[in-house]
Swiss-Prot record:
Residues that bind Na(+): 40, 45, 441
Keywords: Calcium, Copper, Electron transport, Heme, Iron, Magnesium, Membrane, Metal-binding, Mitochondrion, Mitochondrion inner membrane, Respiratory chain, Sodium, Translocase, Transmembrane, Transmembrane helix, Transport
Organism in which the protein naturally occurs: Heterogeomys underwoodi
Cellular compartment(s): Mitochondrion inner membrane
Superkingdom, natural source: Eukaryota
Entry protein name: Cytochrome c oxidase subunit 1
Binding site for heme a3: 376
Length: 515
């Protein structure tokens, strides 16, 4: 029974729960790795060893957080749980493929862990650039195992993307047009399209790297007519859409949370929100070389990538101001989920502003590969994606489990996390402006003060993570069941109660159009 339910599951709710648990566990591993990084950088001098082992930790931290925490939780967890409920579908379009998408991830994770256990580990950074990732600088199986790990995670995501696109287009009630589906459903569909179009390019790039390493091809070796810059183009053609893949489902969740706790029946500017997400998705594909301003591209090429990157700020601004407009005149309930959403809006906007700074190719020459970049993408990921995940988690926790979290603990947890992440990453802007480079385990002692403060912040964040584990335990131990959920008429996922039955919408749902 246990095996049939959890190993061979074809139920979107159970698979969503598996994704959530796996993502939470991977999040703990990723947090542990980040604590190792900040412990090493907490003061000058060496703690862990040389820069190779340090970069293995940094690389693993990135891969674990991106491919095994944010994506499984946002797309696999929230996506699986909420999309069928929100569109009134009985399940996903391909329930067994859904199960395979999940079970490809643990082996993928295993390969990534194995890569650090053999030889010297893969100390390449998450970008895996040759020639550093070639078989000379990284002899042995480490990088090969990392490449196989990425292949599996990529296949998992591509299958999941096909599943979500098919489900969302094909399994709505006949009366519902695409423009009547909730914004979270839109965000997942756009994310799935981005995955479907970008991951094959990554697969091509890392497969060529694999053959360069093992079969003496020279795709990225100038000695045989190849070019390492080609790898960078292939990687970032995936890598830039990837960062939008990480944030778009968060946009969808924040739209729902802000609308719900403002007491509104719909978000401000629904069509504008949809248009903005589609614009971000499209523009995300034509700005990749802003990661490569230092490789010596023509000035006109740099001018194009600078201006195209800045254009993304417009639809992003549409979203930020629409969230603020949604709250305007509302009866705002200061619930923990709303606090996460407000923290998201504030901190994501700061991260966006530093992104605008970095989009200037002239400035990026100086700031590239400094801690300014680290601060920028951790503001949008560690305080964008993660805050959205936390907000979504405390908002939909009653739906997933039938129990309620303790409001006071949840607010304390938010406060500790808010202080921790800001204390960790705000000083890194100063380090970057002062020229401290990334991916080094040691630094001149002029950088000590801000690094020490940053490391203190990371330990505050760690206490927040531990408190969250306690908070979830407390909810399951206390068993406070949900009495009633307000506003269900505009929040379809709640209509079956908390938690919903194993099978929902078994009969086709006919929903009367408001027009």
């Amino acid at each position: 029974m246990f095996i049939n339910r959890w190993l061979f599951s074809t139920n979107h709710k159970d698979i969503g729960t598996l994704y959530m648990i796996f993502g939470a566990w991977a999040g703990m591993v990723g947090t542990g790795l980040s604590i190792l990084i900040r412990a090493e950088l907490g003061q000058p001098g060496s703690l862990l060893g040389d820069d190779q082992i340090y970069n293995v930790v940094v690389t693993a931290h990135a891969f674990v957080m991106i491919f095994f925490m944010v994506m499984p939780i946002m797309i696999g967890g929230f996506g699986n749980w909420l999309v069928p409920l929100m569109i009134g579908a009985p399940d996903m379009a391909f329930p067994r493929m859904n199960n395979m998408s999940f079970w490809l991830l643990p082996p993928s994770f295993l390969l990534l862990l194995a890569s650090s256990m053999v030889e010297a580990g893969a100390g390449t950074g998450w970008t895996v650039y040759p020639p550093l990732a070639g078989n000379l600088a990284h002899a042995g199986a480490s990088v090969d195992l990392t490449i196989f790990s990425l292949h599996l995670a990529g296949v998992s995501s591509i299958l999941g993307a096909i599943n979500f696109i098919t489900t969302i287009i094909n399994m709505k009630p006949p009366a519902i047009t695409q423009y009547q589906t909730p914004l979270f459903v839109w965000s997942v569909m756009i994310t799935a399209v981005l995955l479907l179009l970008s991951l094959p390019v990554l697969a091509a790039g890392i497969t060529m790297l694999l053959t360069d390493r093992n079969l003496n091809t020279t795709f990225f070796d100038p000695a045989g007519g190849g070019d390492p810059i080609l790898y960078q183009h292939l990687f970032w053609f995936f890598g830039h859409p990837e960062v939008y893949i990480l944030i778009l489902p968060g946009f969808g969740m924040i739209s729902h949370i802000v609308t719900y706790y403002s007491g509104k029946k719909e978000p401000f500017g629904y069509m504008g929100m949809v248009w903005a997400m589609m614009s971000i998705g499209f523009l995300g594909f034509i700005v990749w070389a802003h990661h490569m301003f230092t490789v010596g591209m023509d000035v006109d090429t740099r001018a194009y990538f600078t201006s195209a990157t800045m254009i993304i700020a417009i639809p992003t601004g549409v979203k930020v101001f629409s969230w603020l407009a949604t709250m305007n005149g509302g009866n705002i309930k200061w619930s923990p989920a709303m606090l996460w959403a407000l923290g998201f809006i504030f901190l994501f906007t700061i991260g966006g502003l530093t992104g605008i700074v970095l989009s200037n190719s002239s400035l990026d020459i100086v700031l590239h590969d400094t801690y300014y970049v680290v601060a920028h993408f951790h503001y949008v990921l560690s305080m964008g994606a993660v805050f959205a995940i936390m907000g979504g988690f405390v908002h939909w926790f009653p739906l997933f489990t039938g129990y309620t979290l303790n409001d006071t603990w949840a607010k304390i947890h938010f406060t500790i996390m808010f202080v921790g992440v800001n204390l960790t990453f705000f000083p890194q802007h100063f380090l970057g402006l002062a020229g401290m480079p990334r991916r080094y385990s040691d630094y001149p002692d002029a950088y000590t003060t801000w690094n020490t403060i940053s490391s203190m912040g990371s330990f505050i964040s760690l206490t927040a993570v531990i408190l969250m584990v306690f908070m979830i335990w407390e909810a399951f131990a206390s068993k406070r069941t949900v009495k009633s959920i307000p506003l269900t008429s505009t929040n379809l996922e709640w209509i079956h109660g908390c938690p919903p039955p194993f099978h929902t919408f078994e009969e086709p749902a006919f929903i009367k159009s408001p027009h």
